[in-house]
Regions:
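Conserved phosphate-binding loops in nucleotide/dinucleotide-binding enzymes
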Residues: 105-110
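Short alpha-helical scaffolding segments that buttress acidic/His motifs in well-ordered protein cores
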Residues: 46-50, 119, 197-202
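Short, small-residue-biased leader/transition segments that mark boundaries at the very start
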Residues: 1-3
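Charged boundary/loop elements
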Residues: 7-64, 122-135
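Phosphate/adenylate-binding "loop-and-lid" substructures adjacent to NTP/NAD/dNTP-binding pockets
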Residues: 44-53, 58-103
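Conserved polymerase palm-domain catalytic core
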Residues: 73, 80-95, 99, 131-273
């Protein structure tokens, strides 16, 4: 990752998370103690980031209602996390229109679970952001769709490009191999308490109507943790694989641009693609 992206990320981080990010710059460093960083301060930051207009989860509690006794609720949640008593409630599944008569299922967590997801995403982001490649633009601090388009446009006008391959991974978040994802995560995270917490967020039931179902794969769309987990997964199976193993074997220039589960690869000629 380039230094300007890390600087953008660091501007909104607590001093302790900055320390995590600094250690994470060493690719061989493994974190043995991270869970204690999900404290009341981290939970409150996650609360402040919540959109107050978002729908409530299965428990019917809104952000405004949860915030009426915020200090007490955060202290209680932190105690449950510290003692290992926190359990992720089933995620409410709703289907939203996608166009052409199709729908896309998303999951809505209760406020308390959103705070845990948000705190985990903030902490794991400090661990993995230094590792991510410049080709990745989705759901990263200081980067977005316009940055991806600008970078692609620069290559199209400044480099010899004769062929473009567009990739859209169908049902990506629903099809992620959880076992492989956790193996990727544990390469950097040795903290068993944090591992258990991530596991609780992955292996969670889905509430549809009055029934709760469980799946063996995927991460829930709508969870604030899912974009980061998706980036970790695709960093390994696409970004690193293509740039380190595939691109060096090709003749001519090739570039990868990825925004979440959508990607574009440019080639100097169709024959070399």
């Amino acid at each position: 990752v380039c230094s300007s992206d890390l600087a953008s990320t660091a501007r909104n981080m607590s001093p302790r998370l900055l320390g995590v990010m600094e250690r994470a710059k060493n690719p061989s460093y493994r974190f043995n103690s991270l869970a204690h960083l999900i404290d009341e301060g981290a939970l409150e930051r996650a609360f402040r980031r919540l959109d107050g207009r978002s729908a409530e989860g299965g428990d019917g509690v809104t952000k405004a209602h949860y915030g009426e006794a915020l200090g007490e609720r955060l202290a209680e949640l932190h105690t449950k996390l510290r003692e290992g008593r926190w359990r992720h409630q089933p995620i409410l599944r709703v289907n939203i229109p996608k166009g052409r008569g199709k729908t896309r299922p998303i999951g809505i967590s209760c406020v308390e679970d959103k705070l845990v997801q948000g705190s985990l995403a903030e902490l794991l982001g400090a661990v993995y952001e230094p590792m991510f490649r410049p080709c990745s633009f989705g759901f990263r601090p200081g980067r977005g769709a316009h940055d991806a388009l600008r970078a692609l446009n620069d290559v199209l006008f400044r480099e010899p490009v004769a062929y473009i391959l567009e990739i859209d991974i169908e049902s990506f978040f629903d099809s992620i191999d959880r076992t492989k994802l956790q193996e990727m995560l544990w390469e950097r995270v040795a903290d068993k308490s944090l591992r258990r917490l991530v596991g609780k967020c992955l292996h969670v039931g889905v509430l549809e109507g009055v029934s709760v179902s469980y799946s063996a794969s995927g991460t829930t769309q709508g969870s604030s943790l899912s974009p980061l987990l998706g980036n970790v997964y695709l960093h390994h199976v696409l970004d690193t694989w293509y740039e380190d193993e595939v691109a060096p074997r090709l003749r001519g220039r090739t570039r990868l641009f990825r925004y979440a589960d959508d990607a574009v690869i440019t080639f100097e000629s169709e024959a070399r693609s």
